[in-house]
């Protein structure tokens, strides 16, 4: 199948990142794969160091657990891959997405992931596919970034609530409980 890879303009990938990122697509049920995002400017102060720790938890713990059941909730723009047959039918909806009747211009990575999951594709995390990206070094820029991410998370968590409740068999309460916990973490 055909695969599309996204890399943010301010990210740098490791030598084997693409090879590692596309490996899960050998399984036909995989619709998207999230890469492992690291902080490139940890030497520039306290904030990047804290963000590296937060990314470590978010990727190595949270996304790894989500990947176990094929339900990673965000394929980051910094490094992700998509099966074209999974995203082609979603492109118009994704480009023209709205929330509560208004155009939505943030959180495109969470939105496309939600749509892929809604269509019952697996979304996985590949820890060996690494990209390095710069983080803010001052609180003002950090707060703007985190507010933007949080707005997107709230919107997509509401969208995903319906997806999660429809995705799993009614008798599999453990998986439903786990996934709901991951959404609101």
Q: What residue spans do the PLM features occupy?
A:
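Non-transmembrane catalytic domains and loops of membrane-associated enzymes and transporters
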Residues: 1-164, 168
């Amino acid at each position: 199948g055909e695969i599309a890879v996204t890399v943010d303009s301010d990210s740098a990938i490791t030598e084997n990142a693409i090879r590692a990122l596309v490996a899960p697509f050998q399984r036909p049920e995989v619709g998207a794969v999230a890469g492992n995002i690291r902080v490139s400017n940890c030497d520039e102060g306290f904030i990047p160091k804290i963000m590296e720790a937060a990314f470590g938890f978010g990727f190595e713990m949270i996304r790894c657990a989500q990947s176990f059941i094929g339900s990673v909730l965000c394929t980051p723009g910094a490094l992700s891959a998509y099966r074209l047959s999974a995203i082609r039918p979603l492109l118009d909806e994704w480009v023209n997405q709205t929330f509560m009747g208004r155009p939505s211009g943030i959180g495109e990575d969470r939105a496309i992931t939600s749509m892929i999951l809604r269509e019952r594709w697996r979304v996985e995390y590949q820890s060996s596919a690494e990209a390095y990206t710069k983080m803010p070094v001052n609180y003002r820029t950090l707060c703007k970034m985190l507010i933007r991410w949080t707005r997107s998370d709230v919107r997509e968590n509401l969208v995903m609530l319906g997806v999660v409740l429809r995705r799993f068999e009614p008798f599999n309460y453990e998986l439903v409980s786990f996934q709901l916990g991951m959404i609101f973490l």
